[in-house]
Regions:
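Structured catalytic-domain cores with a bias toward divalent-metal coordination
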Residues: 2-378
């Protein structure tokens, strides 16, 4: 195929999908269904499939795997990589976007490949958790260069009892107490302390782990073996929860990527935050995006984290806190209000939100394909 042109970069979904008014139907009810649909769609699209099995099991004792669909050249010079499910329960939107991409992929040049990594944290998706089987936030776990697995932000230590009570979920005026902490320390300081990542409280929120986790380890091994020869890589890591409801926010990792902010914003037709662009809501330690250049040092790279906004931050952090308490101090079963609240907080049930998530996810890949495979990148 010829390289994708700018005119093809942002198609309306109804032009490339047979039933765009039902984009929400790309959403699956659970991990097992999502995995089955992804693998079937990959085979229909003529994609090659790689499967990376994990030792952890799902709630029905089902196998948990990271599945990777590969379209295009088997030894590509240019690669567009789309990842879903780094934060388990957030994978429902990323999985849906990947099904849409398999139904209507962008054109690929002879030396190009589109690679879709389906659910880096299948345990979290299967059990409706943001963290993995060891309570590790995988986007705080990629310490591949410095190997520092200790410590926590000083303010997190002061917030630990508020964030991580050693008891099942209960009414405890969390919102008022968090607001008081924001008044005392500053809202931005509290947000940064909570979300930055910590390695001191293994049962706490945003725990980065004490070692590299099985999912990231499998991913890194696969990445270096399969994509180590690529000259150029554009990676998109799709998440949910941050930003205005149903809108997408694009975040650039500090120090990753050679294109200017203005050039990349023009190519993607979206403003960027983070890096040299506008400030991000918070910075994190041990992110996947920050690790990528060191994993593929010979590859020219661009990376964007795409967030699809859901609900206000207080609702999201409250849902994360309740589910975490249920996991550690209840029985952790799926049939509990805390699980349903977390799913709604990070994957709203409304069709209009789900259609917007698919449109944003699918559209960004098309625009990134124009950048990656266009004549200027050849």
């Amino acid at each position: 195929m010829a390289p994708i042109s700018s005119a093809q970069a942002t198609p309306r979904l109804e032009r490339v999908l047979p039933r765009a008014d039902t984009a929400a139907e790309f959403f699956s009810p659970d991990y097992a269904s999502a995995r089955g649909r992804f693998r079937a769609a990959a085979l229909r699209a003529g994609a090659a499939l790689d499967t990376l099995p994990l030792a952890a099991r799902g709630p029905r004792d089902e196998a948990l795997t990271i599945d990777i669909a590969w379209l295009g050249a088997r030894q590509p010079r240019r690669v567009l990589l789309h990842l879903s499910g780094v934060h388990g329960v957030e994978a429902f939107a990323g999985s849906a976007a990947q099904l849409a991409l398999l139904a209507a992929p962008p054109p690929l040049p002879a030396d190009g490949a589109l690679v879709l990594l389906h659910v880096l944290n299948p345990y979290g998706m299967a059990w409706l958790r943001r963290a993995n089987e060891h309570n590790v936030d995988l986007n705080r776990n990629f310490h591949v260069d410095n190997g520092i697995w200790t410590g926590a932000p000083p303010l997190y230590k002061r917030l630990d009892a508020l964030l991580n009570p050693a008891s099942p979920p209960s009414r405890d005026a969390f919102a008022l107490r968090l607001a008081a902490a924001g008044w005392r320390h500053g809202v931005q300081a509290v947000r940064q302390a909570i979300a930055h990542g910590q390695h001191r409280y293994p049962r706490g929120l945003f725990y980065g782990g004490a070692e590299l986790q099985p999912g990231p380890r499998l991913f890194i091994d696969w990445l270096q073996k399969r994509l180590g020869g690529a000259e150029a890589l554009f990676a998109i890591d799709m998440h949910t929860g941050l930003g205005p409801h149903g809108k997408d926010t694009l975040i650039r990792e500090p120090g990753v990527g050679s294109a200017s902010v203005e050039t990349l914003q023009a190519a993607l037709d979206r403003p960027l935050s983070g890096g040299n662009a506008a400030p991000a809501a918070y910075t994190v330690r041990g992110s996947l995006g920050a690790a990528l250049p060191g994993l593929l040092p010979q590859t020219r790279m661009e990376f964007v984290l795409q967030e699809i906004g859901t609900w206000p931050a207080l609702r999201v952090i409250s849902a994360l806190r309740d589910e975490n308490r249920w996991h550690h101090y209840g029985d952790g079963g799926l049939d509990h209000p805390s699980k349903r609240r977390l799913l709604e907080a990070l994957c709203p049930a409304a069709d209009d939100w789900r259609e917007a998530a698919v449109m944003h996810g699918h559209g960004l890949v098309y625009r990134a394909a124009c950048w990656t495979f266009g004549e200027k990148s050849a």
